[in-house]
From Swiss-Prot:
Catalytic function, reaction form: cyanate + hydrogencarbonate + 3 H(+) = NH4(+) + 2 CO2
A Pfam family this chain is assigned to: CYNS_N
Enzyme class: lyase
Molecular function in Gene Ontology: cyanate hydratase activity; DNA binding
PANTHER family: CYANATE HYDRATASE (PTHR34186:SF2)
Name of this chain's protein: Cyanate hydratase
Annotated keywords: Lyase
GO annotation terms (biological process): cyanate metabolic process
UniProt-annotated catalytic positions: R96, E99, S122
Function: Catalyzes the reaction of cyanate with bicarbonate to produce ammonia and carbon dioxide.
UniProt record similarity statement: Belongs to the cyanase family.
Upper classification of the organism: Bacteria, Pseudomonadati, Pseudomonadota, Gammaproteobacteria, Pseudomonadales
HAMAP family (alphabetical): Cyanate_hydrat (MF_00535)
Organism for this UniProt entry: Pseudomonas putida (strain W619)
Length: 156
């Protein structure tokens, strides 16, 4: 039976074990994900404590990272989600996403409502993808796709 977590502690500690094993084995997230049948973004989020993994995927990941049976079971548990428990994020990369939502959040809301009506974009029925592309002006650009199902507000 899939279990739920009441605090962040167990999954945070497992994340530390996973990151150390990933580094020790010199694996990329893409290599860890291979064979799970799931997306790189979803499995990475799960490894960072944000999602439970299905049993088959947890076993694949566990084998690659030499996790024990209890750790594989913990990967399947429903975590306490979210990473902004300490207020405004201080990590520069995460902060830039926070900043993007601070600057463009109201714009996204206005455009979603104008195009779809009153409602939300689901982060549950959701896909995330990130691609590295060449910038014609030199360097690289990140193309990030957030693909969520629109859920209209229903009067009651």
């Amino acid at each position: 039976m899939i279990q739920t977590q009441a605090t962040r502690t167990a999954r945070q500690e497992l994340t530390e074990v996973i990151i150390l094993a990933k580094a020790r084995k010199d694996l990329s997230f893409a290599q860890i994900v291979d064979g799970t049948g799931l997306s790189e973004a979803f499995v990475t989020a799960a490894l960072l404590g944000q999602h439970p993994l299905p049993e088959s995927a947890a076993k694949v990941v566990g084998d690659k990272l030499d996790l024990d049976a209890d750790q594989v079971a913990l990967l399947q548990s429903m975590p306490v989600r979210g990473s902004f428990f300490d207020g405004v994020p201080s990590d520069p990369t995460i902060y830039r996403f926070y900043e993007m939502m601070s600057v463009y959040g109201t714009t996204l809301k206005a455009l979603v409502h104008e195009k779809f009506g009153d409602g939300i974009i689901s982060a549950i029925n959701f896909k995330l993808d990130i691609k590295k592309v060449e910038d014609p002006d030199g360097g690289h650009r990140a193309v990030i796709t957030l693909d969520g199902k629109y859920l209209p507000t229903k009067p009651f």
